[in-house]
Amino acid sequence: CALKDELGRVSIRQVRNVVGLQGRLFTALAHSNIVVDDIVQTEQGAATMIAFTVEHEDLGDAKQIVARTLTELGEGEMSVEVGLAKVSVVGVGMKSHAGVASRMFRALGDAGIGIHNITTSEIKISCIIDHAEGQRALETVHSAFGLGLGNGATIAMQIDSSRV
């Protein structure tokens, strides 16, 4: 399990999903050496919504780049959230074990920790949460999987040996 805190999220709404939009936006961010994390895109009718997280220290520059991109497009609106964190469960054993996501989500919900965003891959499940809940979320997820904090064992081995 891992915790990454001091994150901000930039959301772009009411932009037409034109070919190349994502490349244009994220190339501009990359040229400014802004590391982007947890990208989510959804379509809402003819418009699209793109949201992504960045380290808090990069938030000001990211906002300027997004504002400039929206001005060039002549459409869209931006919103910014601060005070976020990301808690993740990581391990290659997850792709062969059903129920890892449900265990994580249930544990966070039972602890009263709200989830703002979820991203997954074959080896990772990440939840964006309020920064203030970060440490408690990490401890909650560790407990849900029967892990000790800082015990040095890999989550893949621990998931393999636990019942999901």
PLM feature segments, named:
Residues 1-164:
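A conserved regulatory-domain signal marking ACT and ACT-like small-molecule sensing domains
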